[in-house]
Amino acid sequence: MPRHLLLLFALILAFSSSAQTFSGAVTDDAGGGLPGAFITAKNPAGDVLGDVSLPDGTYTLDLRAWAGQRVTLSCSYIGMETLEREIAQLVAGKSYALDWSLSSTAEALDLVVVSAGRFEQSAAEVTVSVDVLPPRIVETRGTTTLETALEMNPGVTFVNGEPQIRSGSGFSYGAGSRVMILIDDLPVLSGDAGRPTWGFLPLENLEQIEIIKGASSVLYGSAALSGVINVRTRFPDARPLTRITRQVGFYSDPRTEQAKTWNVRPQQSNLRFLHSQQLGKWDIVIGGNILRDDGFLAPEEDAQFNVRDYHFSPSLIGVDLLDRTVDRYGAEHRTRINTNLRKRDTKVEGLVYGLNANWQLGESLNTLIWQVAPDSIYGAFGGAATRTNQLIGTVDPYVQYLTPGGTRHSFRNRWQYLNNDNDNEQSNGSHVIYSEYQVHTTGEQWGIEGLNLTTGLVNMVALSRAELYSGGSSDGINSASNRAAYIQVDQSLGERVKLAGGARYEHFSVNGKGAGKPVFRLGANYQVAEATFIRSSFGQGFRFPTIAERYIRTGLGALQIYPNEELRPEFSWSAEVAVKQGFAFKNTRIGNIVGFFDLALFRQDYEDFIEFTFGQWGPDEGEVPSLDNAYGLGFMSANTGGSRVTGVETSITGRLTTPTFQADFITGYTYTNPISTTPDYNYNPDPDGTPTTYLSTSYNSEGMLLKYRSPHVFRFDVQVSGQKFFGGLSARYQTALKNFDAAFIEFEEDSNLSGINWGVRGWLEENPELPWIFDARIGREWTNGHKLSLVISNLTNAEYSIRPLSMEAPRLTSLMYTYQID
């Protein structure tokens, strides 16, 4: 009898363990199992359970707790279609067998973007050019700052860390960005200079990076004059995720042997970590980064004081959190930690609130001007180096409420703190308090199908104290404020036509001097065929000068920088027409190929265009012209009249799938013709001063090309992934800067300015063009979450300079290990 009871008890356990269990396999077009596919189940209460398919594609999902409920199941895999199934009522005691077959289609590669209209849209159906960089661009290329990831996007270039979108800006000594940088729709530009801190952006927790090209001031305000870069972070889903990445590497010796004044190879050490998890109604994300980068420039001391042979130092294995001291030009040590907290309130349906925070402490030693070419192109010109101890942080409380009728109210805030403690009387600090109230609703409540309406109010206050900005007040204390109201309307007409329109009124004030202006945008998208989309757009932009542009007064050795309290806002409009074509080639000899081709023609015009330009701006009142103040010569932000950028951009994003491997590729080419439309305009009207025009300050005015622009830009990246091994190759190219400030040549050839011999002309004659830059990576992934890869940036160790007087990085060879639990 006891034996029968034991048998009955075992049968009951076996039956109950299989009750409401879903099991099956996930396969691709060729019938092969898909490892890492995500299968989720959702009940009417909004609870989510999930599982990830095993290496053979099989999965098991236990839903015993949901017996008798309606369940919606979905299966997704990156770059493939997402399938859904609904079970009206789970039957108690029943086991379900459910297989999934996912197809690669062009539509599946189409991504959802938020930046284009402040609500989720298909990237193919938006009315403006929006590019999306997936997390793999960051995770597989050994990226330590967002800047190096953005370099892979066609149309995006950098000059000394300053972003350009389609040649919309030049070089401005780090002040007054025309590209708005956002983290989760909130701006992160500094309150005084309007510049980003690239190392501060949280790469360890990326959902995707969205790039809008063209004037976007209607939705994002002043700094979005030529575009927007929005970093969207990821919140946890049903599966907890823990990921740790450890990266060590070294820089190769420069090709110019006489320029190498050191015996120890500079090293780079990087640690990134992330944990995200749902705990009941809480979403919790904790991440961080520790970077120790020696940089690739010369050390502060001569080589004879450091004669160790190259070896991996212990700091590459264990990271000293407290040691932030740097002793080489271009070096940077930083430690960052961030968290995202979100609560889905169970008492008030539709209410969500949370707090995001990100803080970073670091030290860097930077120089904008080399010592002399070619013997010391990795050294620093006297007085041009700055050691900075930086503390930067953001705290972002927010609340969001979704009404039963589908209207979303959100109130988002950001306090941003920045303190740059510099060693050359150029210290600066700022506080920014930003608040935005936004309402988004659809037309369903009014019986208008296809309508999305977004409106909002913005208030921003910035307080700055800096030795740098004494041009505004003797104590260096300055303030700025910004208030704005905007509205955006998106209307679908049937299944094929999408219309968009918006308006914004913005008022700025700096130290009591203000200006306001309305801006507008219009756009349309027409789906001609199943995967063919034609779009057109028109947008206006308005940018008010930053505190730094108006009030900075400093010097870098012989280079003086002067304030301009009379600097006026600049205005812009941009227009484009474009086509996006999806393609799919099934069962070819090499496999299935799907993707999108995009072609855009664009134009952008500027009025009162602000440029950081050289001229006779000094000396200061009461000073006598002398060698110490460069006889009043220097740089200043000035309104230079009108300018225009026209061009064409094309890109291809796609995927090749075979039974044994998968290849993802992104490539693009951008041509721009940025010109001055007022080359004779004198922006130094002082009758006692020398006339200052585009023509008089340009090194090469042929074609009226604007300074610090590269007309031709090409980008390519491919990632090949098999069951165990993966590899990738990147290529990037841009034409050399044909025009820049002639002062860099005139300074060293002016007999009155003795002691300056940068060797710029000789360098340009020997290096008239920029080289192709290649990056490579190869690695192996194990099924238990371990991944090891070798990453080489600047594979050929090309030696080059984009902006005269500033070298770019030589080859960097890194070993990267990642451990992930999900």
Residue ranges: model-predicted function:
Residues 27-29, 37-44, 74-81, 91-139:
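Short, acidic, small-residue-rich periplasmic hinge/interaction motif at the N-terminus
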Residues 95-100, 146-149, 164-166, 179-182, ...:
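N-terminal periplasmic accessory domains that precede
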Residues 147-186, 190:
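Extracytoplasmic beta-strand/coil segments of soluble accessory domains associated
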Residues 185, 276-282, 287, 330-332, ...:
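Conserved C-terminal beta-signal and adjacent last beta-strands/turns
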Residues 186-214, 273:
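Short acidic/polar hinge/loop motifs at secondary-structure boundaries
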Residues 245, 493, 498, 602-605, ...:
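Gram-negative outer-membrane beta-barrel transporters
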Residues 262-365, 391:
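Transmembrane beta-barrel wall of Gram-negative outer-membrane proteins
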Residues 410-413, 417-420, 461, 527, ...:
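Membrane-embedded beta-barrel scaffold of Gram-negative outer-membrane proteins
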